[in-house]
Amino acid sequence: MDIRQVTETIAMIEEQNFDIRTITMGISLLDCIDPDINRAAEKIYQKITTKAANLVAVGDEIAAELGIPIVNKRVSVTPISLIGAATDATDYVVLAKALDKAAKEIGVDFIGGFSALVQKGYQKGDEILINSIPRALAETDKVCSSVNIGSTKSGINMTAVADMGRIIKETANLSDMGVAKLVVFANAVEDNPFMAGAFHGVGEADVIINVGVSGPGVVKRALEKVRGQSFDVVAETVKKTAFKITRIGQLVGQMASERLGVEFGIVDLSLAPTPAVGDSVARVLEEMGLETVGTHGTTAALALLNDQVKKGGVMACNQVGGLSGAFIPVSEDEGMIAAVQNGSLNLEKLEAMTAICSVGLDMIAIPEDTPAETIAAMIADEAAIGVINMKTTAVRIIPKGKEGDMIEFGGLLGTAPVMKVNGASSVDFISRGGQIPAPIHSFKN
């Protein structure tokens, strides 16, 4: 690394809010299955606290050594519905509490995997887990939950979609922060390091390290230097910048893997914003020439950004995965918040943007009197985009307050303006239940 690259890296950290957003250890709990739920809970606690005992210390050590902030250390586990199914328990809150206790013991920020995969129907543990979510999130501090309700290969489980509309409402009623830790997916990935949607897939190694990077401020600063130039130049600039960001993620992942004695999994090539000024994906899009995010051209700008981040990142590391793209959470991005407040960004435009970005309707506050069926219909729309386009989409909706209010979450979760929701009913649509079949182009064999 020459002196110019060293000074560039220092500037990225000190002036442009570059950080490693997360080191996430994925842990399989399949060997913790037990017909007695309390014994299963104890096995889960013991395995997590043993395997991840040094995760936080190693993360802090690497951050100090390289001078690069590592914002979060997290754990993801096997979907708990698979573990709970071996028991005769009627709810899995005790397993959520075991996860929470383990997370607090090892000092991680979040633990993900209170999850179920129901894209084609319910198995024994799935419905029990889903109905346990409101209490599990209300009675724990660090547990995150996700449910996969659709996939390109399976279609969309509309019965589960309806159930999740109800569960989101119940979760919001039981706790202030619970819904911020609950994601509904289509095409969920098994190696996602980001919360709240991380879980450890059954096809993964027993224990693995995945890394998520963050650098929208770095990309914006690079684009400031090419103002007025063609999109060819913009694309090349984003690609080269993404390469630098991802290269550091690769280094951190390899170091963590070696020191913890576990396999290195992937680097997630996502641009993840924070509420801090200078760390916004929205401002990157505006730097391309948009007066404000939400105006015409926003989706095209996001498409360019997303694609070039992937192209630059793929070259920088040997294994990429996770969600890999630009995150557009409203509450976690000061530019997105401003666009909602000035009226240029609405739910319909956000939905269009999710056909491009790496997640979906993320950290969006809606009025608390929004019917469960309307929330379910939002989930169905997002799932349809993901299923048809063969990409991951998700919904993390916050039903709180009334239109125009500001909902304060604090920390990385930021502040969300409560957005207007279409008032026309979707009740008859959602009440049908059943399965929307897989699209014709999913049949590849």
UniProtKB/Swiss-Prot annotation:
Matches recorded under InterPro entries: UPF0210 (IPR007841)
Superkingdom, natural source: Bacteria
Alphabetized Pfam families for the sequence: DUF711
Subunit field text: Homodimer.
Family to which the UniProt record says this protein belongs: Belongs to the UPF0210 family.
HAMAP family: UPF0210
Protein's name according to its UniProt entry: UPF0210 protein SP_0239
Organism: Streptococcus pneumoniae serotype 4 (strain ATCC BAA-334 / TIGR4)
Species classification: Bacteria, Bacillati, Bacillota, Bacilli, Lactobacillales
